[in-house]
Every structure is written in C-alpha cells, then in structure tokens.
Amino acid sequence: FITKAIPIVLAALSAVNGAKILEAGPHAETIPNKYIVVMKKDVSDEAFSTHTTWLSQNLNRRLMRRSGSSKAMAGMQNKYSLGGIFRAYSGEFDDAMIKDISNHDDVDYIEPDFVVRTSTNGTNLTRQENVPSWGLARVGSKQAGGTTYYYDSSAGKGVTAYVIDTGIDIEHEDFGGRAKWGKNFVDQRDEDCNGHGTHVAGTVGGTKYGLAKSVSLVAVKVLDCDGSGSNSGVIRGMEWAMREASGGGNGTAKAAGKSVMNMSLGGPRSQASNDAARAISEAGIFMAVAAGNENMDAQHSSPASEPSVCTVAASTEDDGKAEFSNYGAVVDVYAPGKDITSLKPGGSTDTLSGTSMASPHVCGLGAYLIGLGKQGGPGLCDTIKQMANEAIQRPGEGTTGKLIY
C-alpha cells in the first residue's frame, strides 16, 4: 500500500431468490457498471461454459432491443478459473443485466469492481557487510542496530518469485539477469513506469538489496504508472501467475511448491479477491501480502484479510509498529517497512515506506527458505512465524508482536 487502504464492509443486498449482490462501502472507488461475478463452488467447467453462452445470448438480445440513446455495455471481458475452486468473470453490465445474472442458479455472488492501489507509505553462510538497507540487517539479526546480513549461498536458487505489482525494471543491474517480464494486465507499456514494483522486487531478490539473492523474478503488471488498477485486473494477474507457478497450467504441485508470490497492494475488502488468493494458497503456492497503511484493522482490506495468505505489517528500525501500518488478528508477522532502500527503475535506488516494503521481506525470506529445502506453500507462513522473534513494541490491539528473523 502507498498511503491508505479503504475501509469497507461488504453488505449483502437482497436479490430475490438469487445470488448476493455485495455492496462496496462508501469510500470505495468503484468503477461504473463494472462487476465481478463469482460462480458457486459446485459449478463445473461445462456448466460455466453453458452459463457464459447464456450470458452472451442475453446480452445480444438486449443489444438488439436497446434504444438509440442508451449506452451499450461491453458485457463479459474476462474469465477466471483458479484451481478448479474459483470460477468467475468480470465485465461491464447495466442494472437490468446484473439483476438477471443474480437470479441465475449458477451464481454465488456479485461484487462491484473497484480501484486497487499499491501499499507504499520499503549452513554455508555469506556475510554482506554494511548493508544498504537496515531491513536486511534486521532480518539477519536477533537485535536491532546491526549492519550485516548473513545468508546461505543457496539464496533462493531454483525458486521463482512472482511480483504482482507495477512491473519490474528487468534490466536493472542489481537483478543480474534473473528478472524477466511475465504478463501485463493493465496497459500497453511493458515497463515499470511507477517504480513501486521494481523497489519491491529488489527487496525480494536483488543481488545487493534483496533477501533471496539467487531467486528468479517474474513481473506481473496489474497496476499502471499511477500505481492503480482494477480489482478485476488484479485477479487476472493472480490467475495467470498461479497457472505459470503450477507448471504452465499443468497443475504440478512440485512447480507450485518452488514458487512464491508477493502482493504489495490492496483495496477494500473483496470476497472475490480473497477467494482468488485462497485458490492460489490451496494450489500450494506461498503468498506474502501487505497489510495496508491506514493504521486500522487489516480485516477491512483485501487480499490482506484472507486467512490463508501471509499478511505482513510494517515495523520501524527501532522495532516499533510503523505509525501507518495496519494491524489486527489477520496479521501474521511484522517485517521492516519504514524508510527501506531498494531499487528504482533506470539503475538507481530509492527509499520508501509502507507495508508494501514489509511484504517483500517475507516473500524473499520464503523464497530463501524454500531454497534451503523447507516445504513451500501456505504452511511456510507458519514456519516463518515459528522462527520470528517477539520483538515489536506496542504492535496494536489483538496483533502479534512477532518480527521476522
């Protein structure tokens, strides 16, 4: 998160004999006439295909009947299928069409699409002296104030990290050729024109600035030059990354277990976003997610509120809770997130603050541990919590004081 996550409560509006239509809270930046439609868990691929055929036919009939003054809706624009347990589609629909969709037996719930933003406000052991970011030294030390990062030479080798963000400057020399472009779901610019994603990726796996110095990095661009994008676009990026991490869509558990994902972004609480994240976790992929920067309970943000992901709050250099960091029972661990120095597009560096900077410390640590032979997947978050120190002073009501180590 860059500055604030939007507090939201999803309230179900009644749809007569139909699916729930979830209403965004008053501060959500909803996108007019854009919706995410989620199918019931027992809907098969065949039934899903039949449903989308019905949808197209219904839309065509409405198009033929519409008046010349009414705006034509684009209809279905994206389809999602994550792990066989989350099937959905998104698109542009008018109120009458949404009512028809909500009354279809296959539909579980519908929620408005909205804007999502970045979350910025930062063995054979090798010694890295005088580290360029205090976060590296803190992860490698039991006490605050260190300047050295100790790491095993494996350093995440053989592991792939998917950075779902604003893109990555894959030519930055600190990546040493280990970063590559994956997929762009937001614009026509296959570059990081914002800088957030490059900074995050640098903490995950930069040669000088990262925790997992040998990890492979993949850019999944879902946020634009302003650091924003749609929730439906983010879910498309999540779906693509899951397929790639699972062996190019072949669903191999071995490939999934050697992959990690980082999501230093978020928005209002979204059942669709949480369900997509849970599908990724159930596919055996470790996910680190920023808790958000509104100094409120992270249960109101997504995907931070999804229990199966590893939700990360931000700490300061003196082991305090960063003043902006979200908190609450959904937070799994704290990680350095205030004044974190990492990479900037064009070959330079930048210092940023936010739970966006904390989450990649956990993602990088996850990749590092998998490289050492630890079991991947969502259970890796429990391993990280067991290794963590109870170090955070005044972590927030009902919040763990554990800081990664």
Swiss-Prot record:
It is an enzyme of class 3 (hydrolase). Residues 19-125 form a propeptide. The active site is at residues 165, 196, 356. Gene3D superfamilies: Peptidase S8 propeptide/proteinase inhibitor I9, Peptidase S8/S53 domain. Glycans are attached at residues 121, 124, 250, 262. It comes from the Eukaryota. Transmembrane segments: none annotated. One of its GO terms (cellular component) is extracellular region. This is Subtilisin-like protease 6.
